[in-house]
Amino acid sequence: SGTMYERHHIIAFAMLFTLTGSLGGYFLIRRAAHSLKNGFLNNWLNVFLVLTLPAFFVAMFLISLNFPTMFPIGYILVPTEWLDLYTCSSVIAGALGIVILEQIEKHGLYQKLRQSKLFGFIKENLPGIYAGFIFFLVNLILARAINSLRFNIHSIIFEADAEPWLNIMGYPDGYDVNRAVHPLVLITMRPFTRFIGFFMGENWFLSPMISISMMSGLTVLMAWVFLKRAVKNDTYAFIFTLLFGATASHLLFGSITETYIFGMATLMFFLLLIQADEKRFSILIPAGLLVFGITITNIGQSVIGLFFNKLGFW
């Protein structure tokens, strides 16, 4: 709320939002049309599962609106005085998007992009990316409703210290960590969060909520990648990816400003390396330091994973 309070903020947001949505939507629709004929969406169960995600998002949004003191409708509405400017900017951006799409097709940029490794990853993991994005939005709504600057106590639920971590991660002038079990958060979590805060202006407290929600969506994507590799069945992997994202623990700790979701993300990344049979110390050691730096005790789970994978130390 109150993040966009200048004319240029409204113009930039409207144009960026519309351009991103139109360009991304165009290529997603093309991909979906192909998938319906011969791909992931060719299975009716997959279509049903894909459609449940927007329904879940709408349901969580409506539930949050039932608590106006926690999630006022003003959080997501464009101020009335800026509505005309927002609409005009969106129309201009939409027209610009058409021109950009024509140039992309004319110069064959899309065909060149199809040959890149990034496109290959997106193509193979689009269901997981889609699920991760929807859960990012769900957790963002919950994070905005749950977290508050009015918190002045620790251990609000399951030892989650939302108030101090909101400040540790996002307060512009810095904040004392006072937690020896999280040795590297000031050079991992905080820089990432403060980068997001650069775009939030005076509303720095929004950046921890966004970063937590982004990590939540990322863990959903990593769950999809892990399961797809393990079972070689897209439908099975997608079902359990949705179950993973919709669990109460993931929805809660993917929304509260704490270290839990960052710890989960680093652990899952390490497990993906193990699953890929990664043996290079140049990769494993930095990944292990990241796990250790978020929460010291998490390194034990990484070591257990390496042990059972028979890395080859003996």
What is the role of each PLM region?
Residues 19-52, 80-142:
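Start-transfer (signal-anchor) and selected internal transmembrane alpha helices
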Residues 62-71, 137-160:
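Helix-to-loop transition at the C-terminal end of transmembrane segments
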Residues 175-202, 206, 210, 214:
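Short hydrophobic/aromatic helix or loop-helix immediately within or flanking a transmembrane segment
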Residues 210-230:
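Transmembrane-helix motifs of polytopic, lipid-linked glycan transferases
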Residues 223-246:
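Transmembrane-helix signature of polytopic, membrane-embedded enzymes
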Residues 255-260:
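Short acidic/glycine- and proline-prone juxtamembrane loop motifs at membrane-interface regions
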Residues 262-280:
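Specific aromatic-rich, kink-prone transmembrane helix
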Residues 281-310:
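Membrane-interface alpha helices of multi-pass inner-membrane proteins
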